[in-house]
Amino acid sequence: MADKKGSNSEKLLYCSFCGKSQHEVKKLIAGPSVFICDECIDLCNEIIRDEAAAAGVEASLSKSDLPSPQEIRDILDQYVIGQERAKKILAVAVYNHYKRLKHLDKKDDVELSKSNILLIGPTGSGKTLLAQTLARLLNVPFVIADATTLTEAGYVGEDVENIIQKLLQNCNYEVEKAQRGIVYIDEIDKISCKSDNPSITRDVSGEGVQQALLKLVEGTMASVPPQGGRKHPNQDFIQVDTTNILFICGGAFDGLEKVITDRTEKTGIGFGATVKSKQERDAGEVLREVEPEDLIKFGLIPELIGRLPVVATLGKLDEAALMKILVEPKNALVKQYQKLFAMERVELEIRPDALQAVARKAIRRKTGARGLRSIIEQALLDVMYELPTLKGVSKVIIDDNVIEGDGKPLLIYEDTPKVAGSN
């Protein structure tokens, strides 16, 4: 090894790669008739890391590592309760999408088109959780975008290419990785066309945004500013091809059931006509009959509907499903709060009647699974406030009276029970 400080040799040594002399670099490592400097070694390491990362993306999506639809469904079952048909549809769609990416480089007469996904279901039914779980399972970049914040380019608000910028941020601006990621666009129903009638005011967050999303979802070269930058004319942009990004759009689509019912249940005339009440069928059952024409009537443009060929509907969660959500998933709320209490060396017991009360309260509020945490948080607020300063508490018991606000949690001490908040 030679370095620039101790070089009194007659002949000056040079790096065989960059041509710098031993006086211009910190270290010069000798091989058989060749030399390499420390700067070239660092550059080689950087190239190897980048190539290894790109190879990792390819390897993670290879056929051998890609879980089967049944395996995807089994993993979704661990995190999402109910919605069996939606999980089955998603498992098949995601499997086919990444299987298609695996065979992109192979020459074939048949080209496989991308199948983006539309999730239709009420608030708190599990749409976002399903998309998050899929991304975590496949180890691909994932971003959630809110359609209500999007506007047409040139107006105040976020333009659609901001979605791709967030996706890049989530994978440290590795373009290859981002181009195989998953984008979940929430509240897609909120950008429906407001009316069939023309208006003098421009609908900058309705049809215009749908048109802008159309290109992104279909596949285009999105221009994204460099890290942390804003768009201005005289800068270089990062080009991201969205052709292989899987887009999952979700929305509650309030009022869509009426559109479907009006189409499917025609009123008969005469003695032989079948009279059927519109209230007989469950909303989830009605949504399963959704057709593209219903979505067009709701306010989505036909071109966007055509780019979302896979439609999965989620039903409203009933009391039994909400009770299961509280205790069964890997990250169940009850398990989370039990862990919080365990950090104080206290056991938390939430009785079945309390779970039932939480589920009923969420149904009354019409918040679905999303409202469960706030109900439990409210019920446990006082005891979580007092617990760190209380001595000798070994167990806290929650019943339905605590959830309904008619009672206090029962604190079990080493010797005698005591009610929280009592003197």
Swiss-Prot record:
Entry GO terms, CC: HslUV protease complex
Keyword vocabulary terms for this entry: ATP-binding, Chaperone, Metal-binding, Nucleotide-binding, Zinc
InterPro entries per record: AAA+_ATPase, ATP-dep_Clp_protease_ClpX, ATPase_AAA_core, Clp_ATPase_C, Clp_protease_ATP-bd_su_ClpX, ClpX_bact, P-loop_NTPase, Znf_CppX_C4
Domain spans labelled ClpX-type ZB: 3-56
GO MF terms, alphabetically ordered: ATP binding; ATP hydrolysis activity; ATP-dependent protein folding chaperone; protein dimerization activity; unfolded protein binding; zinc ion binding
SMART domains associated with the record: AAA, ClpB_D2-small, zf-C4_ClpX
Residues at which ATP binds: 122-129
Residues given in the record as Zn(2+) binding sites: 15, 18, 37, 40
Pfam family of the protein (one): AAA_2
A single GO BP: proteolysis involved in protein catabolic process
Subunit structure: Component of the ClpX-ClpP complex. Forms a hexameric ring that, in the presence of ATP, binds to fourteen ClpP subunits assembled into a disk-like structure with a central cavity, resembling the structure of eukaryotic proteasomes.
NCBIfam families assigned: clpX (TIGR00382), PRK05342.1 (NF003745)
Family: Belongs to the ClpX chaperone family.
Task of the protein: ATP-dependent specificity component of the Clp protease. It directs the protease to specific substrates. Can perform chaperone functions in the absence of ClpP.
Name by which UniProt lists this protein: ATP-dependent Clp protease ATP-binding subunit ClpX
Source taxonomy: Bacteria, Pseudomonadati, Pseudomonadota, Betaproteobacteria, Burkholderiales
